[in-house]
């Protein structure tokens, strides 16, 4: 038995009726587990292969009783791909699977490998787990057996990552450096189980510990690791880090860690404890990445909403968070509002349109790209204990498992999702213009789940000073739409002239010229002087009367950065879906 998630924070399944209207989606149960011989109580994220087959694990049952790896083909037929046998094989495979290009599967079991009790006096904790490989025929190879709470770690419970050299990366919840003492049931005896590790297993099967946690930099890593395009590894620790969460083990709030390509470990983010505030704490799900390198995950507590002030005072309901590649965190959503859900323990899946889907409190939730939540499906009975993370196919269908349900041994299900779209990100060309210049960009939409509707585009500019940029969207059937942003250039204004004063100012030098012309030619110097005086007097009169002043008029679009937001609306008559995206235009 691993460190229970419920041991860190009492997990309450909220049985409240939701005040949000549930969307009509179709759920199909693909298989009801019976324990023997097919397995029971599935856990971990399902794996979807290129042929549409699903692979997953059950923590009990199978042909021998120690858990199984199962396969559900594209027609919905389930078969047992492998049954665990217990030590020296593994048992209790709680993590999901990964697949290499050759079709081999890799995973971990939380227990088994050896018959040695793993760090406690509980026989059920025999063996610290294994790393295994299954070839396409279902033949197993044990790549590594973890020691008895030793320096190499124990209780791996999250998915692995596989790099291009064939090296596997993962984490163990205990083992490694000493310093993490927990109470062990049934008598609560305190045992130092170690703070957990990050490990690797190379292509030849040699395991090495890359980092041992110290509680200060995190403890009890959970959810495995993910790898970005630059080959950096990321994961979460259930606790450790900042001492600001009295409801968690060690009073710590949890962390997100990073391991770069040189092997350098760093605490990427330390949760601050957000009960009644914006931040979350106690992350216990796997992370996911988007194409831009942003990380997303959930926290089991924290956020801005308290779920049960009477029974759990001061404990908020959890969050969905984002971390940029620079380590800047944003809470995208706080649980516990109108959707009557909280304390998420599962991770997320994100579609191409930027929508998130997850299992929490017996609900399948959607958080759209605009940050609005909706309920896609509400489980009933034992099915409310959903296990593992969802996975999505190219058509937008979601697949997942429930831990109990049906025969009390769990199910595999498929759920349709509603059609949706997103306005694709755009970049203006040029991105910087002088006042009076213009920029354009092609627009497109990203569709998911069979979206097939007309989209009407509008655009807006912020801020909006006098002479702010103007934007418009043009579209021709069958071609991408175009957004055009134009700015105003400076202009010069010459004020109007008063008729009488202007006439006086003009006649004065003319009369002077006539008078001067009557003087003799011998008085040329005097004539020149008088002519100059007349011209100066006339010009002075012209300016004084407003006839010759020149002032600045329209100064054009002020310099600065402007946010250009394009909004797409589908089903124009009802306004059912509104999606937007933005770009920056710099005016020099």
Predicted feature locations:
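Extracellular beta-propeller repeat domains
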Residues: 2-423, 435
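Long beta-sheet-rich domains in secretory-pathway and surface-associated proteins
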Residues: 418-588
């Amino acid at each position: 038995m691993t460190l229970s998630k419920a041991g860190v924070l009492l997990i309450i399944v909220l049985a409240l009726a939701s005040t949000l209207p549930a969307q009509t989606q179709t759920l199909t149960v693909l298989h009801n587990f019976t324990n023997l011989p097919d397995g029971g109580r599935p856990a971990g994220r399902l794996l979807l292969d290129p042929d549409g087959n699903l692979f997953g694990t059950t923590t009990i049952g199978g042909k021998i009783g120690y858990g199984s790896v199962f396969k559900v083909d594209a027609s919905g037929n389930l078969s047992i791909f492998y049954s665990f046998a217990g030590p020296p094989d593994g048992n209790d495979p709680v993590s999901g699977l990964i697949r290499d290009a050759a079709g081999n599967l890799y995973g971990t079991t939380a227990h088994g490998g050896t018959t040695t009790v793993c760090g406690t006096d509980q026989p059920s904790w025999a063996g610290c787990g294994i790393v295994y490989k299954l070839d396409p025929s279902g033949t197993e190879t044990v790549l590594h057996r973890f020691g008895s709470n030793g320096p190499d770690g124990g209780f791996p419970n999250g998915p692995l990552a596989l790099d291009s050299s064939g090296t596997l990366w993962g984490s163990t919840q205990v083992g490694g450096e000493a310093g993490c003492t927990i109470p062990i049931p049934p008598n609560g005896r305190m045992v130092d189980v170690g703070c957990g590790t990050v490990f690797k297993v190379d292509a030849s099967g040699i395991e090495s510990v890359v980092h041992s946690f110290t509680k200060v930099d995190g403890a009890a890593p959970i959810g495995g690791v993910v790898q970005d395009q630059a080959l950096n590894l990321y994961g979460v620790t259930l606790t450790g880090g900042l001492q600001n969460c009295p409801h968690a083990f060690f009073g710590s709030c949890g962390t997100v860690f990073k391991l770069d390509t040189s092997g350098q470990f760093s605490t990427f983010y330390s949760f601050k404890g957000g009960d009644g505030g914006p931040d979350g704490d106690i992350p216990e799900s796997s992370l996911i990445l988007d194409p831009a390198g942003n990380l997303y995950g959930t926290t089991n507590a924290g956020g801005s909403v308290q779920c049960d002030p009477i029974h759990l005072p001061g404990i908020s309901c959890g969050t969905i968070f984002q971390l940029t590649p620079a380590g800047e965190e944003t809470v995208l959503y706080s649980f516990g509002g109108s959707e009557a859900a909280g304390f998420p323990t599962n991770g997320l899946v994100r579609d191409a349109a930027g929508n998130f889907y997850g299992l929490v409190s017996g609900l399948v939730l959607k958080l759209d790209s605009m940050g609005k939540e909706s309920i896609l499906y509400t489980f009933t009975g034992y099915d409310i204990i959903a296990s593992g993370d969802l996975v999505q196919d190219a058509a937008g269908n979601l697949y997942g498992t429930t831990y109990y349900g049906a025969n009390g041994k769990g199910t595999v299900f498929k759920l349709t999702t509603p059609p949706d779209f997103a306005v694709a990100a755009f970049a203006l060309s040029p991105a910087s213009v002088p006042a009076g210049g213009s920029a354009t960009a092609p627009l497109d939409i990203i569709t998911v789940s069979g979206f097939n509707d007309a989209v009407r585009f509008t655009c807006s500019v912020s801020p909006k000073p006098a002479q702010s940029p103007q934007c418009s969207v043009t579209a021709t059937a069958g071609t991408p739409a175009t957004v055009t942003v134009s700015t105003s250039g400076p202009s010069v204004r010459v004020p109007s002239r008063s008729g009488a004063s202007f006439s006086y100012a003009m006649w004065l030098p003319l009369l002077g010229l006539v008078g001067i012309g009557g003087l003799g030619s011998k008085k040329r110097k005097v004539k020149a002087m008088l002519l100059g005086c007349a011209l100066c007097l006339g010009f002075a009169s012209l300016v004084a009367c407003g006839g010759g002043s020149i002032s600045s008029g329209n100064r054009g679009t002020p310099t600065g950065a402007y946010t250009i937001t394009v909004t797409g609306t589908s089903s124009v008559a009802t306004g059912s879906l509104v999606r937007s995206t933005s770009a920056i235009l710099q005016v020099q």
